[in-house]
Amino acid sequence: MKSEIFIKKQNRLLDVRATAAQIARVQRDSGEIPWCPDQKTDPWDHVEAAMGLSIGGYLDEARRAYIWMKRTQNPDGSWYSAYRHGNVADRTRDANMSAYIAVGAYHYYMMTEDRDFLQRLWPSVQRALEFSLNLQSPHGEIYWAISPRGRVDRMALLTGSSSICLSLRCGLAIAARLGHQRPRWTAGLQRLENAIRNKPYRFNVTKSRYAMDWYYPILGGILVGSDARKRIGRNWKRFVVEGQGVRCVFDA
C-alpha cells in the first residue's frame, strides 16, 4: 500500500512556485536558509535553496541568501560546515561546500543578467575556489575538508569532487563574463577531472554504496556520452527501483 501511494504522488506535477514559497518561509531575516525551521544550515544546501528561490521567482530572497554567504565567509575563503541561528555549529571547513557559491552566483546571473550583483559576489567566489584548490593533492583529487582543529583530512570524496568540478566550471564562466583569466582554475579542473576519470582508487570507496557516487561524475559533467551511459548501465539495477525512483543507499 505504501508503495502505491508513493507512486501515485510521483505522477503529480511539481508546483515550483509552492516549493519556492516554502523555502522563503523557512528563510531567516538574516538571509540564512536552514534545512528546516530550527535546524542547522550548511553552505551547500543553503546555495541549493537559494537557486530554488530564483527559479520560483523569489529573486530578492535569493539575493539575501547570497549576501548572507558573502557576510559569513571566512578570511581563507571557506565557510564552516554548519550554522544554527547565525552561530557556528561545526567548524569543519569543507572544500565542496565552500566552492558551491560559484554555482549559485552563476545561476543567479544566468536568470537575471544582473552583472553588478555578479561583480559583487566575485571576490567571494574567487576566495572560495582558491580555498578548495589549495586542498588539491599532487594526484589531482581534492581533500574533502580541514578539521575543526585545523588539520587537513586527506580523504577525497567522489561526489564532492564531482561537485567541485561544476563549481570550477561556473567560476571560470563568471571570470570570462567579467573579463578575468584564471589559468590555475583551468589547470586544477583538468587535474581533478583526470583523477575522477582515471584514478578511482584515489577516492574513498566505502562511499560507493551511496547513489550519489554513481551519478555525480555524470551530473558534474566529467563523464559524458558513451562513458556516462556505461556508468549508468553498470549500476542501474543496484540503485533504481522501477516505478519509484533511485534509492539513496544500497545495502545488500
Language-model regions, residue ranges each:
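Low-complexity, Ser/Thr/Pro/Gly-enriched N-terminal "stalk/linker" regions
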Residues: 1-44, 55-79, 132-133
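Helix-terminus loop motifs that line ligand-binding clefts
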Residues: 57-129, 133-136
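Well-ordered alpha-helical scaffold segments within catalytic/enzyme domains
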Residues: 1-9, 47-61, 100-117, 162-180, ...
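Extended ligand-binding clefts on enzyme/binding-domain cores
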Residues: 120-166, 175-251
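Residue signature of alpha-solenoid helical repeat architecture, marking inter-repeat boundaries
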Residues: 40, 44, 96-99, 155, ...
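Glycine-/proline-rich flexible loop or hinge segments
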Residues: 33-34, 46-51, 66, 79-89, ...
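Detector for glycine-centered tight turns/loop "hinges" at secondary-structure junctions
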Residues: 30-32, 76-79, 86, 139-141, ...
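Structural signature of alpha-solenoid helical repeat scaffolds
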Residues: 10-11, 37, 41, 93, ...
